[in-house]
Design a protein with these regions (language model features):
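Short, hinge-like loop/turn segments at secondary-structure boundaries
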Residues: 59-64, 166-167, 197-198, 223-225
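Walker A/P-loop phosphate-binding motif and the immediately C-terminal alpha-helix
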Residues: 9-53
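Cytosolic-facing regulatory segments adjacent to core modules
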Residues: 72-132, 137
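Beta-strand-loop-alpha "switch" segments that mediate conformational coupling across diverse proteins
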Residues: 184, 197-225, 238
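Acidic-aromatic/histidine active-site loop/patch
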Residues: 1-12, 170, 177-178, 182, ...
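Conserved catalytic-core segment of NTP-binding enzymes
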Residues: 108-112, 118-119, 123, 128-206
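Phosphate-binding loop that captures ATP/GTP phosphates
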Residues: 35-92
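Conserved nucleotide-binding/hydrolysis micro-motifs of P-loop NTPases
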Residues: 49-50, 98-100, 153-155, 185-188, ...
């Protein structure tokens, strides 16, 4: 369960995948918006360094990026000074604008930035690139909760997911900190979800339906669907994920929050 840590130590929520086009960035953006709406200080870091799309999804034109942070004086720089505010109550640490700027990034630079953001925000959401790169491995070490969005309408994606889960086990990553999210649930496919769960040896914790039109419209407008189309099925299903993670329980027509430690 998600909860605010002690002052100066925010939670790090990482969105990670073993395949492209599984909805990772859409979910990361909407998680950031939902947490910010609830009054938390939130920063979304776009760590898909070469081809990050967070700013495109939010219609942002950042003046500073992670590259500018890397070029600043190492002794005095603070990642929180390089973020871009959004109209939705959270900040974004943007990915480098140019490919050659992304090439100089390394695990030390990225981890340092994330640690500094952790000291300034209640939640730091990481939208990572695909695969087990050196940078991603360093981010896994910092992660409090790891979200793995996936789809089951494409066999190579299932194969990659199985490989990724096996790798997490080899890395001895604490499975209590992992959330499997089936995106595009009930899309047209001949593949059984139960068969996929049997292959993975793990059940999906969350299911999000297939709404290509809703996602496309959200990206076109540069607005998170959980804020702009709250009555849609897509927004409702995404909201169910973070409501469950926050431990929100419906009482008397509203929501009450209760917080406890992540794992006791």
């Amino acid at each position: 369960m998600l909860s605010k840590k002690s002052e100066g130590e925010g939670q790090i929520l990482t969105f990670f995948s073993m395949a492209s086009a599984v909805g990772k960035t859409v979910l990361a953006v909407n998680f950031a918006a939902a947490l910010a709406e609830r009054g938390f200080r939130v920063c979304l870091a776009d760590l898909d360094l070469q081809f990050g799309d967070v700013c495109n999804y939010l219609a942002l034109a950042p003046e500073q990026t992670l590259y500018d942070y890397s070029e600043a004086n190492e002794a005095t720089r603070n990642a929180a000074a390089f973020v871009t505010p959004t109209a939705f109550g959270f900040d974004v640490l943007a990915a480098p604008k140019e490919l050659d700027e992304a090439f100089i990034m390394n695990a030390d630079i990225v981890s340092s930035a994330v640690n500094q953001l952790q000291a300034a925000y209640d939640f730091v959401i990481l939208d990572t690139t695909t695969g087990f790169s050196a940078i991603n491995l360093s981010l896994l070490e910092l992660t409090d909760v790891l979200y793995l969005p996936c789809v089951v309408d494409f066999i190579p994606s299932i194969k990659n997911l199985k490989c990724g889960i096996d790798t997490l086990h080899k890395l001895q990553f604490d499975w209590q900190r992992v959330r499997l999210i089936l995106n595009r649930n009930k899309a047209e496919t001949q593949i059984s979800v139960k068969d996929v769960e049997a292959l993975l040896g793990r059940p999906f914790q969350y299911f999000i339906g297939n709404d290509y039109r809703g996602v496309t419209q959200s990206i076109k407008e540069g607005k998170p669907v959980v804020l702009t189309d709250k009555d849609s099925r897509l927004a409702d299903e995404i909201s169910n994920v973070f409501s469950s993670e926050l431990g929100e329980q419906e009482e008397s027509g509203g929501f009450s929050k209760w917080f406890s430690g992540l794992w006791k």
